[in-house]
Amino acid sequence: MEKHSIFYAMFIPSMFLFLLGLGFRLSLYLQGTLEGEENATSWRKFVILMGRGWRGFRKKPLWYLRVLISDVIFHRKLYGQSFYRWLTHSLLVFGFVATFLVDMIKGFTTGYLVEWSRSLPVFSFAHAFETGRIRPFLDFSLEFFSFLILAGCVLAIVRRFIFKPDQLRTEEEDIITLLFILFLELSGFFIEGYRIAHPEVVTRRVYMANFTPPSANNWLSFGGFLLSLFLKEMAVDPDFLWYLHVIPSLIFFIYIPHSKLLHIFTSSVTVIADRAKKKPLS
């Protein structure tokens, strides 16, 4: 069975479990009362809140975007409390958001539009994302943003296990989350380094992505390229490495709704709602 089939055979159930967990957490939030709709069902409350949010966004889209960037992603209030905490938060959240966006662009253009361009020439521009001029920017961006996540994770670990502020409580959930992130980032860089050090991995199409552009194998992928210098003599089954990274990634994906990482999603809603109350949208 080819890698695409194996991946989607694992990804689709993972997506279902992720949405199931997200739905469960959402149902807990919707148990509260909604002003003016005290007797509404959970589904009715969800529809009302979505409607209010959409109407507000349509009136002031730039305001919503500004609040999302300044108050959620870069958490400006935290900056005044602790630069270290602010830096850790910003590296992790911005790193995750940026990596997700770039990865979605790369995956959609190189994984779908390139295929569609074979029968629909209108999508031929997508080849610039696969092997053309845009590809080096994608490779470097993914590398850089992944490095930000790794740096933020290390800062969080140092604060929790070395500095240990008196007011900070480290729970088992925090340890699991940080170790998950650390493992996924390190394994990702290791696999990239091994792939660069062993060109036969690319020719055998062990991984799903297209690694033909030179930018995928040189200093633009700086983390993997540096590791590749030490992995040329190492022999590891590349299929094993693929599973070692993909399976924990999907487990982590399922785990998100049940972890404090859900804060990345819920905090944006809470912060924007609070700001909207202080500054009514007219």
Give the location of each predicted region.
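Membrane-embedded alpha-helical bundles of multi-pass integral membrane proteins
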Residues: M1-S282
